[in-house]
Amino acid sequence: MRQNYDDRKIVKQYREIARQIVKKEGLYKNMDQAELCEQTNFWREKFKTKPMTDRDKINIFALAREAASRIIGLDAVVVQLIGALVLGDGKVAEMKTGEGKTLMSLFVMFIEVMRGNRVHLVTANEYLARRDREEIGQVLEYLGVSVALNESGLDIAQKKAIYTADVIYGTASEFGFDYLRDNMVRQKEDKVQSGLDFVLIDEADSILIDEARTPLLISDRKEEDLSLYHKANKLVKKMMKDDYEMEEHKRFVWLNDAGIEKAQKFWGVESLYSAEAQSELRITMLLMRAHFLMHKDKDYVVLDDEVLIIDPHTGRALPGRRFNDGLHQAIEAKEGVEVKEESRTLATITIQNYFRMYKKISGMTGTAKTEEEEFRQIYNMDVVVIPTNLRVNREDMQDDIFYTKKEKGRAIVYEVSWRYEKGQPTLIGTSSIKSNEWISGLLDAAGIPHQVLNAKNHAQEAEIIAKAGKRGMVTLATNMAGRGTDIKLDPDVHKLGGLAVIGTERHESRRIDLQLMGRSGRRGDPGFSKFMISLEDDLLEQFESKSWEKLSAKLKRKAPRDGKPVNSRKIHAVVVDAQKRLEGANYDIRKDLLSYDEVIDLQRKMVYKERDLLLERNKLGVSSEKILREVAEYSFIHPSDIPEEELEIYYSRQKELLGGTKFPISFDQVTLMEPREVVEEIVSWHKKERNKFPAETIAAIEREVYLNLMDQMWVMHLDAMVQLREGIHLRAYGQQDPLVMYQKEGAQLFEKFQADYHFYFAHALLELDPDGLIQG
């Protein structure tokens, strides 16, 4: 991606600072390790009271540069220092693959530690976190900076030890889950995360954009009638195209009138949209999504009778991750494997809202400029393209577009065969396991040996990528093709043209295409890239346009069956347009997810803040007497002109509040008393009972009960919000915006949640027994 004017201006500004850093390389040359550590301590102390100047930055970068030269034998070049300065400004640095992002990270992490910040370095997976912690961590430790690796499966004591380090490496999900788990603990001492100061995200586009569609969830099992999934599967398998409508690129499908009638007959209900048929409607819609929108070997893979999600942007299977809200169960029913119980959400947060809690955030990646608008709007981060140290020496060809997949397949085999014969290594990129296996079959038939990398054999990824640059090697890979690792070329491959990259489909995002192209031509190596696509590819199949349908039909009728590609500007323009439309649709989905999550994010922050206060004080923030009085007044005092039917609600609430408690006045007697008198009796009796116990004992009991009830009700509230989110589009009507309806009804549910746990806490206060314990 080329630099724009603003990028060039920023790079020019930092180039001079970077050159001054390089000129300082003699400053620390003669110091031993102890003296370098003294320098580290000097800078740490200085910035506790004074701001950091550009001159300070130059000296600190020079210190880190000297340590890197000694420990790992790498001297940071000017462009790496420019990139680090960009990161220090809270921006995304786009640096081409192989240009040294890992070394670049050293400088910004070191300088943030000098500022007094704890640093979290987030990578795409635990393998990369471990690798980078070992390589760059040793440089930081040489300078007296503590470094740790945040892995899954550690106990609280181990986690707490990790979070005392200055720099912590880990994955986005592990940091996010630690945050969620911290807000489920019962004792303050069990919290592990100690502040969210600065986060540096490697492969920022993958983590902040691609993974943003899947929220982080902590869950347990939810009781449900799983047989409904199998029944709904039978219904959906019988559906014809005229029973439903769908917009595949928006991932949305719905029943038309014919489909509704068929479903109502199948389920034996008068109206599919009645309250009684809520479960049947929900599960029918889930099975429709599973059958018509979710595709095997593209969206998921079945391995050992288990449905595994495929990350659409990396091609990797995601063990342990499940589609939420019942979709995973629907796919299991569709595929005829065991339908496992749906999970119940205990805690959840989106990637976007987790990382937006950090005081400062920076990112680095090989491809980000195409998504700059999203980085700005959601994370308030600009993207700056960092120039390469050596000129990119890769030949990028215009797409070859064929009429049919069959013609495309033949052309790919021909292209690969002559490159294989001359010994040039070739990487063939596919967008799904299905197309990956189809191309593999064609290569087998042509007698071309090759290695295959996809979600089914991801365990061999490092080994496969290590061989991909060898002379004569043909590698067939989905999007997962070794992101974060270099494809190193054999020495004699350079004269053969370097690594050739053949893309077999344009992806839903130009960024993914650029990543594939970026496998070749690293660090000034020669290389070649070309996409060979067809009019029957998924990208164009999803592209709904009357003009495109007419053009496609016309082209296929007139197509010369010589297997040659189409050289038409109009078709190239359609491909570009289709890709842009799908990018826009996917951005809308992510923005939509964030808009809905912002409703619950505000609620989550309020609940977690109250939890923190409870853990901090070890007692209630307000007196139990005040809560009891409010609940009693709410239950017993009502307007005199209240309708008869609403009186029943009041009586029911009064019975629930007093029923089964130690309160000495019977409910029959209570009904004969004045409401205000009842309230005062309840409050005074509780006060008398409470005073029988030591203050610390009763405070601890009340705090524990309150916390327990709040947590239980919060889980129920999250479930209610999921149900609301699922059904809001089905209930949207007229000109009403579903999001506005969700915000309004979500606020009402939150008010109910707060009222409920206060109510049950008041009930519990009236259950105090003579030993100071609460029954039930």
UniProtKB/Swiss-Prot annotation:
InterPro entries the UniProt entry points to: Helicase_ATP-bd, Helicase_C-like, P-loop_NTPase, SecA, SecA_DEAD, SecA_motor_DEAD, SecA_preprotein_X-link_dom, SecA_SF2_C
Q: Name one GO molecular function term.
A: protein-exporting ATPase activity
GO BP annotations, alphabetical order = intracellular protein transmembrane transport; protein import; protein targeting; protein transport by the Sec complex
Cross-referenced CDD domains: DEXDc_SecA, SF2_C_secA
Family, similarity comment: Belongs to the SecA family.
Q: Which Pfam families match?
A: P-loop_SecA, SecA_DEAD, SecA_PP_bind, SecA_SW
Spell out the reaction equation it catalyses.
ATP + H2O + cellular proteinSide 1 = ADP + phosphate + cellular proteinSide 2
- Protein name in the entry: Protein translocase subunit SecA 2
Gene deleted: what happens? Cells show reduced secretion of autolysins p60 and MurA, as well as at least 7 other proteins, and are responsible for a smooth to rough phenotype change. These deletion mutants are not as virulent as wild-type when used in mouse infection tests. Large in-frame deletions of this gene reduce secretion of autolysins p60 and MurA, as well as at least 7 other proteins, and are responsible for a smooth to rough phenotype change. These deletion mutants are not as virulent as wild-type when used in mouse infection tests.
Gene3D superfamilies found in the cross-reference section: Helical scaffold and wing domains of SecA, P-loop containing nucleotide triphosphate hydrolases, SecA, preprotein cross-linking domain
EC numbers, comma separated: 7.4.2.8
Spell out the subunit comment: Monomer and homodimer. Part of the essential Sec protein translocation apparatus which comprises SecA, SecYEG and auxiliary proteins SecDF. Other proteins may also be involved.
Q: Name one GO cellular component term.
A: cell envelope Sec protein transport complex
Q: What class of enzyme is it?
A: translocase
